[in-house]
Amino acid sequence: MKAGTACVALALCACHEAPSRRASGASNLVLITVDTLRADHVGTYGYARARTPALDALAARGTTFERAYAAAPITLASHATLLSGRYPPGHGARDNGMRASESVATLATVLGASGFRTAAFVAAFPLDHQFGLARGFDVYGDRLPRMPNGQPSNERPAAEVINDAIAWLHTINNQQSTISNLHFFLWVHLFEPHAPYGDPASGRSVIDRYDDEIATADREIARLLDALAEVRDRTLVVAAGDHGEAFGEHGEYAHSIFVYDTTLRVPLIMSGPGIHEGARVQAPVTLADVAPTAAHAVGAAMADVDGIDLAPALGGGALPARELYAESFAPLVEFGWAPLRALRTDTWKLVAAPKPELFDIERDPREERNRAGDERSAVQNLTDRVNRYSAADLPTPSSLDRETALRLRALGYASGSAIANQPSIANHQSPITNRPDPKDRREVAARIAQVTSGELTGPALLSALEGIVRDDPRNGQARLRLAYARLQAGDCARAEPEFHAAAATGLPSADIYLGLATCFGRRNDLAAAERALDEARRLEPDNPTVVANIGILRSAKGDQPGAIAALRSALAADPALNEARFNLALAYARSGRRSEAAATARELLARLPVNALQRTEVERLLRAVQ
């Protein structure tokens, strides 16, 4: 252990008092979530090729839950359940891009109100503070680095997350002289195993690259646990995956669509005072159990939760028989297909869908034989019960700003475009029967996973998108992606009709008309480009990218004052729009306002990373106006 880390740990250990408030001897809580981590790729779960010594050592010091399940196979919904103890219908964040309800208590709000210092450090944009999980945290570290083009990244390395977490421990340690009874709740979220896994051009298999990223996350977990070693006897550590990952099982790749156990089963390990070491719990549990269990362990309580306190199992006892709920609303929210809901009992697992599936999970743990046709009474009984879980209102997702939608899309999520502004999502009982069953769209879903994984480029990417559109012609998001892929390949003649086809699906996206404006501009049809931008602005009047493109068009038409006004307005709304800043400098130069052009170009150079591709062009402009 490094000397500085040891000092932090020893000092924190010395500060802990007030044993009366602790139910298990723990006065601190550390929650570690690893995105997209399958249980069967962790050593303690029997994976022969595992490279997870830190997680395995944590399991040896604590209790491993053999059958732990996420409530949703997607990042935001699963984490909202984990932090609140509520299933997705209860917290409202049922897909990425939605927002967790402010009325729902979380570990952070409960422990913060009890005097705990609270901090979270997350690694990816789906957990950005705007989506509602930052409530109750004194510090919510969601700042992501910028890419070479100056735009914000959508994720950051595990090492940066752990560095921030350890730095926060230093901070609260340095403040110990003013804190009489120090208790802390620290949550760290690591994104490494999420696609894309490493470099697809490396020649290594997808599984090998996935395991490489798990190993990276595990090394950083080891660093954090080392920093906490001296407070181990007073700290509950919970490590969990948020959901799994599919590699072809059931025809699925990646996650978010289906609710098979390949994407729902996750590792869940708890270690701390009063917890049996090396114990293994066979009873099925849900991530909704984490919040009530952790709160109780540190002397607090979570009210109005769907999960239960797992304290009996942590002490070697039994858990009651019960049923567990899970859902995926991504098929509806992202593609307009039927949502999927699952209910697990000791014997059965129902997947409620237009074509329901029923699995005997004791005899058929891989969910390979659908018994729905043979067990109709069980299907009806479980369907009635699953409907009770998902009876809560589902807020209609608000239209996301373009940057948010693009950042979610870059991580493989279509971000609500399929059903935006359709109130029927709030009553999701009816859409189940009159929408496509995701099972009947397996090949489309597999191609979508390929497209969003980062594994495909060039002609292979175009071919996959063409296959999606051929098999699912009403998929507006796929048509939009195909249109942009053709546009980027320089094929405006084929991109333009695809943009129109995307609009015909009812997709309410300004991106359609931004793409059309680009096509029209390339053939110098400025009047058509202006009409397209007017439609984009009608759809998204406050979208700074739309306003910036209006400014660029005005400059091309010779209206430099109008261009300057629009570009300045766009930059006031979003200072990160580097292309708008460059075009503002051009408009100043074309107006003869050389000093303002030079100042704008210098400001842009200061914002661009040293290795940004645009620097040469900006430097050329600066030389011309000086």
Locate each region found by the language model.
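Bacterial N-terminal signal peptides
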Residues: K2-C13
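Catalytic domains that recognize anionic headgroups
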Residues: L12-C492, P497-H500, A504-T518, R522, ...
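Canonical positions in the second alpha-helix
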Residues: G467-I468, A501-A502, E535-A536, S569-A570, ...
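Structural marker of alpha-solenoid helical repeat scaffolds
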Residues: D471, T505-G506, L539, A573, ...
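Boundary/linker segments of alpha-helical solenoid repeat arrays
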Residues: G476, L507-D511, P544-T545, N578-E579, ...
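Ankyrin-repeat and related helical/solenoid repeat scaffolds used for protein-protein interactions
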Residues: P561, A565-R602
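Terminal, low-structured helical/coil segments at or just beyond the last alpha-helical repeat
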Residues: R594-Q626
